[in-house]
UniProtKB/Swiss-Prot annotation:
Protein name (database record): Anaphase-promoting complex subunit cut9
InterPro entries xref list: TPR-like_helical_dom_sf, TPR_rpt
Subcellular location: Nucleus
GO annotations of cellular component type: anaphase-promoting complex; cytoplasm; cytosol; pericentric heterochromatin
Region (Disordered): 1-24, 622-643
Gene Ontology biological-process annotations: anaphase-promoting complex-dependent catabolic process; cell division; positive regulation of mitotic metaphase/anaphase transition; positive regulation of mitotic sister chromatid separation; protein ubiquitination
Organism this protein belongs to: Schizosaccharomyces pombe (strain 972 / ATCC 24843)
General function of this protein: Component of the anaphase-promoting complex/cyclosome (APC/C), a cell cycle-regulated E3 ubiquitin-protein ligase complex that controls progression through mitosis and the G1 phase of the cell cycle. The APC/C is thought to confer substrate specificity and, in the presence of ubiquitin-conjugating E2 enzymes, it catalyzes the formation of protein-ubiquitin conjugates that are subsequently degraded by the 26S proteasome. May play a pivotal role in the control of anaphase.
Description of its domains: TPR repeats 1-7 mediate homodimerization while TPR repeats 8 and 10-13 bind to hcn1, burying its N-terminal acetyl-methionine.
Disulfide bond annotation, renumbered to this chain: none
Amino acid sequence: MVVKRTQTDSRMQSTPGNHNHPDAHANAAYMTPPSMGALNANNSNSQLSTLTISPMTYLANNTSTDGSFLKERNAQNTDSLSREDYLRLWRHDALMQQQYKCAAFVGEKVLDITGNPNDAFWLAQVYCCTGDYARAKCLLTKEDLYNRSSACRYLAAFCLVKLYDWQGALNLLGETNPFRKDEKNANKLLMQDGGIKLEASMCYLRGQVYTNLSNFDRAKECYKEALMVDAKCYEAFDQLVSNHLLTADEEWDLVLKLNYSTYSKEDAAFLRSLYMLKLNKTSHEDELRRAEDYLSSINGLEKSSDLLLCKADTLFVRSRFIDVLAITTKILEIDPYNLDVYPLHLASLHESGEKNKLYLISNDLVDRHPEKAVTWLAVGIYYLCVNKISEARRYFSKSSTMDPQFGPAWIGFAHSFAIEGEHDQAISAYTTAARLFQGTHLPYLFLGMQHMQLGNILLANEYLQSSYALFQYDPLLLNELGVVAFNKSDMQTAINHFQNALLLVKKTQSNEKPWAATWANLGHAYRKLKMYDAAIDALNQGLLLSTNDANVHTAIALVYLHKKIPGLAITHLHESLAISPNEIMASDLLKRALEENSLTSGFLNSKYVFEDEVSEYMQQSNLNTSDKSMSMEDQSGKVTESVNDRTQVLYADSRSEMMMDDIEGNVSEQR
């Protein structure tokens, strides 16, 4: 089809009758889009949106001088419509009713008649709806259409992205935004027609190109620029938040600094609050609570899935997994195809040990959405839950291959290596995650934990410090920093980290039981400073949270031995051996405690009494410790969603074991 440049009728050359109407200039652009050279920022229609070039918008805004609508808006009266407008409405309605052959048939005719770039844009939209991106690109790049219309340029670049021609798309869009040379003038045009500015959409598309070229720094800047150009460009905001390209503080700063000046006070508060729902749930709790309350007060929004999901996120951070499941289940009952809910829902099921539900959900997702990355994440989490690690790894890998930007899949893949002690592969996978998701602290945290397992304390400290620089509100991170300080014999720093971790747990977690190991770590640090009373208090706190922890009983016994109170030490060592009869350290300490006790209370009498007590306790070897899980704070998003809490338990519990030393003060790791 050859695009003809024919003269349109006088009706197509006009503007709305009321020239003071705020969309008058925009509607003029619909009629006669400005001719522009290649990305000429001084002569562009990039400040407009596709609303401007919609035939429905034009007819709706084309009013008479007294403000009454023209009779052309009456669908039953089309006598006064020109042939071109009649064809445009026909094409548009066919497109809205998914009658794409009809829309293409009519669209080709109106383009032949008018040669208007806007008609070319809508015909190309029809081709895009059928997945024929090559044909759409061919149409938009002939006759220099993309140089005459920003809408055509944007859509041509979009087609090239869909065709994986990254360099071609970048050539059309430009490596940087050419329209931002005069920011003051640009800001005046933000709300010209109420839609999303094409300039913002092109910035977003430029970010997509850089993302696929693995240039994440440039991609991040493009997404941020898209939002600064037009705060309504939600796609750019979602890329920044869901892919963790910004730190938690950077996310909040961006939302607060967006240009809301062109909105009313109420609309600005509404949009800002909507965006806040997507941000990190640990920092800025007061602002988040106010945003939730404001949106909940709006009639109908209390049922919004985004608002409910925000509440579920907050509960997940507080380890209230049953409450999380109640909310996510409610959302899925309303909309079972809301895939954004599944990462959090699956993580909570894993935390709760719901193997059967994970199995059913995984099968359902495989049947309904085999092409989605979250489907294979669900399968991987199920296999992780039943301890089939190799199968879990395979499906995590499949999920990350289908969507390379899907954070939970990458972290689950890395965790599967960590569980089996394959540290090199785990480090490689975590490093990839750190490169992809630059704004989240979790990959650096896991890298530090891996190097600590390998005994590389200096490297572990570097990664943990990098993690802390990104996010300071994760108690697990603070615990690990304390362990590093302990291993460097910096006991006061270790105590500070452990105390800060426990304060944060008290503030943000409803379930403190998983953090018994941190109390034990604090007790060990106090013991090393010979602050024995403080050590016993901390260890007893850990014992209250985890009554069946043999390590804590052994640690308390060790402190009592230091205090020369062998009788109480023996009592706790009996408890330890009753829980874990094969505990070598407890057995050795018991022998020493018995020897020391015999010197003060009579060797012969005490010897047989204590030996009888040990025998009695060792008969209780069938006692089982409770299965503990330590969930992590959820970052913007759902990078880990605690897909592998077993790894975290291994590290957390090993902290107490690693920090146990014998009575002379030498550290003896018990793994």
